[in-house]
Design a protein with these regions (language model features):
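Active-site pocket-lining/capping segments in soluble small-molecule metabolic enzymes
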Residues: 1-120, 124, 138, 145-301
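A cross-taxonomic marker for long C-terminal extensions/tails that follow the last structured domain
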Residues: 132-135, 141
């Protein structure tokens, strides 16, 4: 499985700028991931906080041998947001992951990546996007293993990369309305960035007081954490080329090393799960892959 590469997805949450800068410094110096995705993908209002750190972070990651990819917004409503995506896609010598169709025109004819928010669910969609320059697809996390197998079977013919999320809370939906602001009796325009008070998202509970989902500004995620360590060998056999780890408020160096050790054959999937549990991460889910309810965890008999 050594040909399969680890990637670190973009930070979905509103972390303080200095905390993000320091986080990426550690990733550059200590993490075994091959590729790092940067950029604000959830809320354009958060973008100015980190923009002035971005050139230095890109330079440091590149110096450490990481492939750096800039991810676009996934929710585009305003003209300035369309302009942000257009400007990003037109930057020379810059790898871009598109998470909204607003970026397709600007990126057409140039190599670019398609992010999980683009909802590429079948091989014909992948083929059409590849004709326009897409050379890498991060698949939606709710896809089953059987569907991923069909998508991955086209990878060689299309000469594209296939990426699947293997760790972290699962992005499920995004809205024009801000759930975080509403939860604090604020409007979206006057949110005062209250989402920053929950650096791993705000848990939503059922009427029975059971944890159900997580909100992150305008985004909805799973409450439980995806852990696909037991499925990695199957993914590699299917032709999945990249495995995505999503950043959270835990020791991400330990998380990425746990998966890297498994890819290199130094540990088992069970070892990975034990190491993650030791970091107080969980409970775990992997239901989507097995075509059952996504919030469930399927254990092989």
């Amino acid at each position: 499985m050594e040909t399969v590469k680890l990637t670190l997805g973009p930070i979905l949450f509103h972390w303080e700028a200095e905390a993000k800068r320091d986080f990426y410094a550690r990733i550059a110096d200590e993490s075994p991931v091959d590729t790092v995705y940067l950029g604000e993908v959830v809320c354009s209002k958060r973008t100015p906080f980190f923009d002035h750190h971005l050139p230095d972070v890109i330079e440091r990651l590149a110096r450490a041998g990481k492939t750096v990819v800039l991810s676009t917004l996934s929710e585009v409503v305003l003209p300035r947001e369309r302009a942000m995506i257009r400007d990003l896609c037109e930057m020379p010598d810059c790898l871009v992951e598109i998470n909204n169709a607003a970026g397709l025109l600007a990126a057409a004819g140039r190599p670019h990546r398609i992010g999980p928010m683009m909802n590429v669910y079948n091989e014909e969609t992948m083929r059409q996007l590849a004709k326009r320059g897409a050379d890498h697809f991060s698949l939606p996390p709710e896809m089953s293993g059987k569907t991923v197998a069909v998508m991955a079977s086209s990878r060689v013919a299309l000469d594209v990369g296939i990426e699947v999320q293997i760790f972290g809370r699962v992005p499920l939906a995004i809205s024009a309305r801000c759930f975080h602001a509403r939860a604090h009796q604020r409007s979206k325009d006057e949110c005062q960035f209250v989402c920053g008070e929950d650096p791993d998202g705000l848990a939503l509970t059922t009427l029975g007081d059971e944890d159900m989902l997580t909100i992150n500004g305008v985004q909805t995620l799973s409450y439980r954490y995806l852990n696909m360590a037991p499925e990695i060998a199957e993914m590699a056999a299917l032709g999945v080329s990249h495995l995505r780890i999503m950043p959270h408020q835990t020791d991400m160096i330990a998380v990425t090393r746990a998966f890297a050790d498994h890819l290199s054959g130094k540990s088992t999937a069970e070892d990975v799960t034990e190491r993650l549990a030791g970091l107080k991460i969980g409970p775990f889910i992997n239901g989507f892959w097995h075509a059952i309810a996504g919030h469930r965890y399927h254990q092989a008999p």
